[in-house]
Amino acid sequence: MENQNTKKPLVNVKALSMMFKVRGTLFKALDEIGFTVNEGDFFGVIGESGSGKSTTGKCLIRLNIPSGGKIEIANHLLSGKKLTKENNQWLKQNIQMVFQDPYSSINPTKNVLTVISEPLVISKTVFGETKQYLKSLQKLSFKVKKTLLRNDIELETKFHNNFFKTVIKQINESLFNFEDLDYKDLKPSHLRQRIINETDKFIEKIRSEFALFYDFYANQSVPLQKALDDANSSLTPSSVIELKNQLKALQKQAKISKAAWDILQALKQNQKELKDYENYVHFELQKKPRIYLNTWLLTTKSYIKDSKQNMQLTDDIFAFSYNSMVDKKRNLVLILSKYYKLLPYFYDQSVFDNADQFDEIANLIFFDLVETLLGVTSLFNDALAADKVPLIKFAKFLNKLCDLRFLTLKKSFKKTRVSCSFSFNSEPEILFANSCYDLQQMPQIIKPFWEKLFNEQNYQKIIDSVSRLNVMIANYITKAFEIKKTIDEKLREFKQQNLALKKAYSANKKSEANKASINELKVNLKTLKKQLKQEKNTTKKQSKKELKPLLKEHHTALKLHDEFNHDLRKWFKKLNFMVKKYNRLENSQKKFCLVKKLKALFKKQDETLQSELRPKLKTFGVINFEYKRAVKESNVFRLVHFAKNIFKPFLFFNLTKIFMRNKVYEALDSVGLKREHAYRYPHEFSGGQRQRIAIARALITKPKLIIADELISALDVSIQAQVINILKDLAKKHNLTVLFIAHDLSMVQTVCNRLIIMHRGKIVERGSVDEIFSNPVHPYTRSLIKASPKLSKINVDLASFDENFTYDSDYSLTNMPFYIKVPNSEEHELYCTQKQFDSWIKEATPIN
């Protein structure tokens, strides 16, 4: 197993929650789950239906908006109600999802070409590539353009020679086979079959050459890259590219003095640094931290919703009081977050630091009340009937005391322009307590809790916690204003430098002392122009000599199309001749009577030889269509390469369509489909082929993460293996990270390296695949593995899955589960209580 510590984390999920509204209540589909996926991982997610697997995947790609928690993928925060424009664009390009039903992502009314290219249109990646292609053309020198023309002609000539020479040869072979056919000695049925077989054989050979069309389409942009490579490899100081660059620089430099030129360059550099610094400050110290802050607040609000719902649904006074206290604690955290509005700048990491510290201090402020309530709850279970009433009354009292403490802190919160602070006074609580209970008549069962709660040491701890909170807020505010001071000084320094450089530039621009250097530059300018002209003339002469034989060969190659049409007409004449011979031979062997003549009159049209051959001969129409398109696209590239710049924007969308189609061809090749499949519709494919199309659609934007949601569940075993092998090969080739959601444990064990097991919206076990399958500990995991069907004992296995799990029935306010690491393992962890862990570890044995 590869050491996971050497890999970079790609996906970081923390406290992810997803709640759905169901008839006025909130159903928690995901309950604060967290996991990390490293780059290049094949990460498995397994569990029964309804465990939250698909919901997790949909939250990552934002088909479901998470109710709370943090989702960070490649340092892009993707949780929260809204995404920034940049993060939204990044998400569309770098995360894709493949569903169990291919029709979830495939539109059945559109052909495969349109379906697969949809992500390119949505993410707009292909538009950027087209712009880059057109930009590279603007920088070409005269010499490189001539090289590009030569490469264009060579490509077109090669295509005509390869395709039409081969096809003409096949036509002649087919004509020879027809000539060699001795139809006089054959029966009509045998002759018919020979004609059909020969036609099928010829058409199949023609179809096998269609790949040359697709190669020609894909290679249209190759000449430009080849020309640029040739230009870069032969770059010399006297080359056209170098001369043009020098010419542009000197034209600008000749207008001003040398000193002014140097100052101008320094001014531009200073302005660029200023702009970069302002962008950094805006994004890293303002925009990005606010995004993290909003995510944290959303998570806190979802926790508050959860607490309020638990309060409404429970009929247990102790659970009600506990959830009420949790609600007050989280509302206090919301009040604390208000101080962020004072901060002009802060780091995103400070949000997480504050979140942890706020939670810790809020827990300390309410800890005495929560601890007392848990003690009362624990005592209530074993108490006598007479003691239960005062315990219930005391639980209600603790809840009201918590409300009072929260209101006291809320009212004491003071916020000014430069500070925020709380204050705490124990007097209101003591007065309230004395009004509720008489110390002399207080039940004995409550007295220990009362004495522990209402003493100076306890209240001093609360005052210390509040003071610590105030100090922490003051420190962060001070730090934020120090950052502001540093930024203001830096910006002021940049602006002062700009002013100084502008003044120096104005003073040196018309300096008489630089006349000599300006004259020298002008002389150099004239020399360079002469060099440029000479270089152009030399290139023209050389290119004429080089292009003559190429143009002659190209002209000869173009004539092959006419020769192909001529030979094809001959082949059709021969085929018609053979069909007529067959009809005569068939008629000569029939003895016609009136009844047979009437039968022949009403004979179905599709039973004749002509009707059987007609659909087969449509292939030649396809050749004509593909050739016309090849010529049209060749002309588009010729115009893009050599037309004036003013006309190129009108060709932008034509060029984009060509690039898009070529990418679709590459995607189809990568999943083992043919390029001609791009023009079919989804219903014309099998289930496995449709799933391949869905994978091609997901891969076309070259994403970093693919979420495979029960990708192979609906396919038969052999097709499952094919699809998984394709996905594994592509993941290895493109360094993809795959989140593999599945029911099939044997497949997960084969392809995944890390794994989480989900049940009822929680991760109950997680770790490496080898560690979990060699030593499954959690009862749910063991039941899943036992129920995995094996041919040797299928009757036993299918009946062994236990649906009525009660492991979580013991969880309570005083017995909360947490993650515990399994001994002698690297990352194998269980979600359980310590008592359960000790029991399960003893009982855990390998499952065969």
Curated annotation (Swiss-Prot):
It is found in: Cell membrane. It holds the Pfam family ABC_tran. It is a peripheral membrane protein. Its main location: membrane. Its EC number is 7.4.2.6. The keyword Translocase applies. ATP binds at residues 47-54. Keywords: ATP-binding, Cell membrane, Membrane, Nucleotide-binding, Peptide transport, Protein transport, Translocase, Transport. PROSITE patterns: ABC_TRANSPORTER_1, ABC_TRANSPORTER_2. InterPro entries: ABC_transp_ATP-bind, ABC_transporter-like_ATP-bd, ABC_transporter-like_CS, Oligopep_ABC_C, P-loop_NTPase. It comes from the Bacteria. GO terms for molecular function: ATP binding; ATP hydrolysis activity. GO terms for biological process: peptide transport; protein transport. One of its GO terms (cellular component) is plasma membrane. Gene3D superfamilies: P-loop containing nucleotide triphosphate hydrolases (3.40.50.300). It catalyses: a [peptide](out) + ATP + H2O = a [peptide](in) + ADP + phosphate + H(+). Residues 13-785 form the ABC transporter domain. Part of the ABC transporter complex OppABCDF involved in the uptake of oligopeptides. Probably responsible for energy coupling to the transport system. The complex is composed of two ATP-binding proteins (OppD and OppF), two transmembrane proteins (OppB and OppC) and a solute-binding protein (OppA). Belongs to the ABC transporter superfamily. This is Oligopeptide transport ATP-binding protein OppF. It comes from Mycoplasma genitalium (strain ATCC 33530 / DSM 19775 / NCTC 10195 / G37) (Mycoplasmoides genitalium). The gene is oppF.
